[in-house]
Amino acid sequence: MSTATGPEAAPKPSAKSIYEQRKRYSTVVMADVSQYPVNHLVTFCLGEDDGVHTVEDASRKLAVMDSQGRVWAQEMLLRVSPDHVTLLDPASKEELESYPLGAIVRCDAVMPPGRSRSLLLLVCQEPERAQPDVHFFQGLRLGAELIREDIQGALHNYRSGRGERRAAALRATQEELQRDRSPAAETPPLQRRPSVRAVISTVERGAGRGRPQAKPIPEAEEAQRPEPVGTSSNADSASPDLGPRGPDLAVLQAEREVDILNHVFDDVESFVSRLQKSAEAARVLEHRERGRRSRRRAAGEGLLTLRAKPPSEAEYTDVLQKIKYAFSLLARLRGNIADPSSPELLHFLFGPLQMIVNTSGGPEFASSVRRPHLTSDAVALLRDNVTPRENELWTSLGDSWTRPGLELSPEEGPPYRPEFFSGWEPPVTDPQSRAWEDPVEKQLQHERRRRQQSAPQVAVNGHRDLEPESEPQLESETAGKWVLCNYDFQARNSSELSVKQRDVLEVLDDSRKWWKVRDPAGQEGYVPYNILTPYPGPRLHHSQSPARSLNSTPPPPPAPAPAPPPALARPRWDRPRWDSCDSLNGLDPSEKEKFSQMLIVNEELQARLAQGRSGPSRAVPGPRAPEPQLSPGSDASEVRAWLQAKGFSSGTVDALGVLTGAQLFSLQKEELRAVSPEEGARVYSQVTVQRSLLEDKEKVSELEAVMEKQKKKVEGEVEMEVI
């Protein structure tokens, strides 16, 4: 078969020519549109009232915001086309901003101070704007240099009509993508130094080479001392949380829980930073709205509108749950972190909590967040350490924030587990391949178990040891559990209850050393357990109050107890003896004698305490004096009072008490150590805590006003759309 030859025969393309043709076609397609996932960090308008007049000023301000944890990265897509650079919403692909290539004044990769990788810088000058905008982006999959080359190639093609430079840039981009580098290795997280995490990390490094000082977990402190390894125990041997896992695992457990706390603080601060950015964007939009002459959307407003959008209800719920979780975790870690301690770190959360409550419309929304429940230790930590202003906020949030989970109805569904913005998850198993339990849920389970185990115990702690079927008549006649108050007690805060000697009180919760009781007037509060003794209680078939029942005909006298020695005679007031309780009838004489001796010792201690508490000339204590506050405007006397209130030694107080607040705030850690080698680091930590509290207070008022305006504006737009 002959093969056609000659000029009319089409030449057969070679493999090389086919490859070149496909390469040219691929280049045309690639040169048309490219798209990059990026994080938008911040936008500055040059010349506005924030001290940013040049690109260098913008870079320096970004570094300052980054060091303060005020940079909120917002993920989006950056698309480069032959005539525009467009920003898109990554989920909906909605166009946020579109900048003509002719409006791009500068495109560069810059390295702000304190960063390890470059950022993409875009300076855009719109015709209708007097000053250009400066945008900073962080590449997620590719470095800023490659994205810059693509945009600069598009600019060169736009201005000269020649596309070789962009084609080369896109080929370099494809080669980089084909290397399939790990995103985690390519893109480190945005540099943030949250104040609380930095303080905790400093404590860890100073305390034990980056590890917290691991002490027994809270439930081990309150439970009975565990038996030596190899011995048997009757205390719920099936529960792994009642016994320690050994000193090494105790340290690992403390480290794990401190790490969880760090990530909770990270997420809370990230959310607050987002609120601040949203408020700033709303303020800029409002400023532009007042100066706008036409209804056409100005350049840059799509990005600002997205930033000004407040968080969703689910996001508010998530951060409020994490704050509740942090309260319980701080109480659990009370023995593992110091300088600052858990009570001091507690104050860090109230600034964000106040801001979140205000921007969500008030305490009603936060009150609806029931999970996770607070532990009893968390409620005690809050009750004993909040300031009057914090207490006002705390009590406004309702029972789900002020009462422990033991007093609330159980929630349906799986236990709460925090999910962190960064995707981090705590280790699942320990080195022995045993599963770690969630620390807060573990504490709640322990408290429930402890209450169940203590319920049938004898009247040493006010409980009855009666089987329901053994005393049906008594069960029907006595409502609840009743105690007699032996001493006057004056409440010191809103959660405590003032009581008088010989008051009959109903016990609502006796799981801790402070019992929750109700007086005859129906008022509830906490009183110390060691001023109370068991009382039979009022009879339901009598129409009389507990207070009147005390003065009415007393019940028949119980069987007499063994007479104590004369030197330890009991007080004269009338009250039931230990062996007057029916629950002791089944005990042998040696056990009865043991309980009698316990009562004797307890009464002697109470009598000695009463000598210092009561007396005819004893003044009724007033409300607790407010703790001295430190600020840059404090004088030397206020600084001295603040140092004394924090418990520093007289040498440290004398050395630093001559400074003003501004001078003390200006000192660095090494300078404080030079003045006081033993306590300099702790002074620096306390000053850091105080500085953060002051910064939070300054931010709240401005943010509240801006968010309220933004909320009204959004509501107005919704109403207009409905109309």
Curated annotation (Swiss-Prot):
Example of a GO cellular component annotation carried by this entry: ruffle membrane
GO BP field: positive regulation of ruffle assembly; regulation of Rho protein signal transduction; Rho protein signal transduction
Extent of Basic and acidic residues compositional bias: 162-183, 571-580
Positions bearing Phosphoserine: 182
Bias (Polar residues): 543-552
Pfam families linked: EPS8_2nd (PF22975), PTB (PF08416), SAM_3 (PF18016), SH3_1 (PF00018)
Domain SH3: 478-537
Skewed-composition ranges (Pro residues): 553-568
Keywords of this entry: Coiled coil, Cytoplasm, Phosphoprotein, SH3 domain
Residue positions where Phosphothreonine is found in the record: 187
Subcellular location: Cytoplasm
InterPro entries xref list: EPS8-like, EPS8_2nd, EPS8_PTB, Eps8_SH3, PH-like_dom_sf, PTB, PTB/PI_dom, SAM/pointed_sf
SUPFAM superfamilies: PH domain-like, SH3-domain
Region Disordered: start-end pairs: 162-247, 442-477, 537-589, 609-636
UniProt note on tissues of expression: Detected in placenta.
Residue ranges the record marks as coiled coil: 689-719
PTB domain ranges (all copies): 35-164
Molecular function per GO: actin binding; cadherin binding; T cell receptor binding
Its job: Stimulates guanine exchange activity of SOS1. May play a role in membrane ruffling and remodeling of the actin cytoskeleton.
Family: Belongs to the EPS8 family.
Subunit structure: Interacts with ABI1. Part of a complex that contains SOS1, ABI1 and EPS8L2. Associates with F-actin.
Protein name listed in UniProt: Epidermal growth factor receptor kinase substrate 8-like protein 1
